[in-house]
C-alpha cells in the first residue's frame, strides 16, 4: 500500500511539473503595459502565426492572457494556469510536435470617460480593430520549437518587433480624404476623437464651384481608401471570369 501511495505521489507531481511554459520579455518597452498578450502556435510557416488564426477548421492555435499595469522590465510567464486558448482551451493539451511560435501584445489604452468610468480598451489606430495589424502593437519573430507535453519546457520569447504606422492615403483629382474632430465623442471619451471619410467627387467639381450635388453615404468597414474606382477603362481583351454561383 505504501508503494502505491509513493507511486501516485510521484505520478501526480510529475504531471504538475511537466508543463510547457513561455517566458515573454519586452526589451524595447518602458513603464507599465496593458493589453492582451497572445501566444500563437502554427504547424506550418506559410505565413506568420499571427495571420493564421481563423474562424475555419484550418485555424492555428492562440492562447490569451490579459496584463494590467505589468512592469515592462519584468518577463511575463504564460502557462496553462493563466491562459485561455482557441481552438484548444488549455495550453497543457497541445499535442506533441513541431510548431512555429510567435507572441504579440495587443496594447490597451486608458480612457477616462465623461460618465465617470475609467476603462482600458484597444484604441483603433487605422487598421479597423485588427489586432494582428494594429500599429504600435509589439510582437516576436516566428521561431520553430518542439513541444513535448510529458517534459518540463520553458521557451523564451522576445517581443522586439513593432507594427509600423499605417500610411495615410493620398488625395487625387477625384478622391479626397477628410478627418474631423467630433466634439461629442471627444467629450465622452476624454481624449480627441475623429471621424474620417473618403470622398469621391464628380467630374468638373473643381471648376463648377456654384453647383450643388446629391450626397450618397456608404458606411464601410474601415476601408483604407476609396475602392472600385479608376480613371482608365479596363482592357477590352480581358477574358470573362464568371463566378460559379
What is each model feature region?
Residues 1-22:
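Bacterial Sec-dependent N-terminal signal peptides
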Residues 16-19, 29, 92-96:
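Short, surface-exposed loop and linker segments with low hydrophobicity and enrichment for Pro/Ser/Thr
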Residues 19-26, 30-37, 193-198, 217:
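Contiguous beta-strand segments within globular domains
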Residues 43-84, 89-245:
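Non-catalytic cap/lid and distal C-terminal segments of serine-dependent acyl enzymes
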Amino acid at each position: 500500500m505504501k508503494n502505491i501511495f509513493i507511486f501516485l505521489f510521484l505520478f501526480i507531481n510529475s504531471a504538475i511539473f511537466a508543463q510547457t511554459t513561455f517566458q515573454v520579455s519586452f526589451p524595447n518597452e518602458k513603464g507599465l503595459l496593458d493589453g492582451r498578450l497572445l501566444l500563437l502556435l502554427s504547424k506550418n510557416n506559410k505565413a506568420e502565426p499571427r495571420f493564421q488564426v481563423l474562424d475555419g477548421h484550418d485555424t492555428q492555435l492562440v492562447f490569451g492572457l490579459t496584463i494590467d499595469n505589468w512592469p515592462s522590465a519584468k518577463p511575463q510567464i504564460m502557462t496553462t494556469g493563466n491562459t485561455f486558448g482557441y481552438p484548444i482551451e488549455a495550453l497543457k493539451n497541445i499535442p506533441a510536435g513541431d510548431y512555429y511560435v510567435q507572441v504579440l501584445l495587443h496594447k490597451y489604452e486608458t480612457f477616462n470617460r465623461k460618465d465617470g468610468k475609467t476603462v482600458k480598451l484597444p484604441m483603433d489606430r487605422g487598421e479597423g480593430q485588427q489586432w494582428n495589424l494594429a500599429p504600435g502593437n509589439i510582437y516576436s519573430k516566428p521561431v520553430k520549437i518542439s513541444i513535448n507535453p510529458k517534459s518540463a519546457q520553458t521557451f523564451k520569447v522576445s517581443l522586439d518587433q513593432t507594427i509600423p504606422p499605417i500610411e495615410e492615403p493620398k488625395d487625387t483629382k477625384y478622391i479626397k480624404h477628410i478627418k474631423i474632430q467630433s466634439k461629442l465623442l471627444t467629450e465622452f471619451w476624454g481624449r480627441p476623437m475623429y471621424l474620417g471619410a473618403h470622398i469621391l467627387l464628380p467630374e468638373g467639381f473643381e471648376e463648377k464651384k456654384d453647383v450643388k450635388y446629391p450626397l450618397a453615404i456608404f458606411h464601410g468597414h474601415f476601408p483604407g481608401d476609396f475602392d472600385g474606382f479608376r480613371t482608365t477603362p479596363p482592357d477590352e481583351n480581358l477574358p470573362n471570369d464568371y463566378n460559379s454561383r
